[in-house]
Amino acid sequence: MSKLFLRILAASTIAVGFLALVSIPSARAKDEPVATAALTESDLAFLKKGLAKKPKDSELGTLKATAMMLALYSQNELTGSDAAKAAGRRDLALTIAAALEKKDFAAAKTALEGWATAKDGDPKKTVKLHEQHAFELSELMAQFSLGRSGGRHIEADLKAQAAKLTDVKLATELGGRVATIGRYAALMPAGDAVGPKKQKWDDLCNEMIKLGNDAAAEGAKGDRADKPALAKKLAAINLNCKNCHDVFKNN
């Protein structure tokens, strides 16, 4: 098997489609979201680092959101060949989120350490993830904040890579992460997203999902990725964020 084929195969794994969190009322929701192997690895590492010491209060929202992201990645794999394992990991991710909600950091760390050996769960069990453990929009969006503020540095990385794309792997991860955040956000509207503004929220979230998927799909090409095109896709995500904040100023 050639090294080129292996590189293409590895890159393609991040572009495999997965199911939506729940149905989102828009044609945009039919777009295939990106797969999760690289995102899962990154999120597990982030949680491990964050729980290596007692987290600061400013870090709690992002840590909890990261656990909820892991839950969604796993729930989206419930129709695969390892559905029972995916269900078990979804449940374990929710256990981590629940422990973080209670500030039981020892329990969160213990649950995280059991990720690789998670017990099988029930793939037929439906869980409305966005309704679990008092998950809030502010926690979801905290991931965009700077690392020193407890975030995942998403906004800063998006702007930097859009201005000068230097890291295709990072750009791919950013796209996948943005798409996943968009799927949650579509079901967690801002408090002032009512009346005509609710439709605006839906439109912006669905655009966010599509733009994230597009960036991740381009980045998944690895060495064959069109870097100028990928940078433009990241710039489009930045514009989507700006447009959202222009309407929903307190979110």
Q: What does each of the following model-derived ranges do?
A:
Residues 29-251:
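Mature extracytoplasmic or organellar-lumen-exposed domains after removal of signal/transit peptides
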Residues 1-17:
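Bacterial N-terminal signal peptides that target proteins for export
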